[in-house]
UniProtKB/Swiss-Prot annotation:
The gene is rpsS. The keyword RNA-binding applies. This is Small ribosomal subunit protein uS19. PROSITE patterns: RIBOSOMAL_S19. The lineage of its organism: Bacteria, Bacillati, Cyanobacteriota, Cyanophyceae, Synechococcales. Keywords: Ribonucleoprotein, Ribosomal protein, RNA-binding, rRNA-binding. GO terms for biological process: ribosomal small subunit assembly; translation. The keyword Zinc-finger does not apply.
Length: 91
């Protein structure tokens, strides 16, 4: 279930200020953020945002297809190492 239209999309104020500042200066340096719940807006297209996954910051390059999604969707928090093999072999 999505967020109410009258409220608008959620984006952290600090992240919004950093993106607007870079857009004014035509700067495309990496922006670090811990806000995985922030929605990707059209003004972020072309920026690289380093999203925290609990251990490190994962760089995410924002494209048009990502608009409307959350930043946390593109920074996985779990590493899948594969299923363990049977010790007995195949029966």
């Amino acid at each position: 279930m999505g967020r109410s239209l009258k409220k608008g999309p959620f984006i952290a104020d600090s992240l919004l200020r950093k993106v607007e500042k870079q857009n004014d200066n035509d700067d495309k340096s990496v922006i670090k953020t811990w806000s995985r719940a922030s929605t990707i807006l059209p003004m972020m297209i072309g920026h690289t945002i380093a999203v925290h996954n609990g251990r490190t910051h994962v760089p995410v390059f924002i494209t048009e297809q990502m608009v409307g999604h959350k930043l946390g969707e593109f920074a996985p928090t779990r590493t899948f190492k594969g299923h363990i093999r049977d010790k007995k072999g195949g029966r």
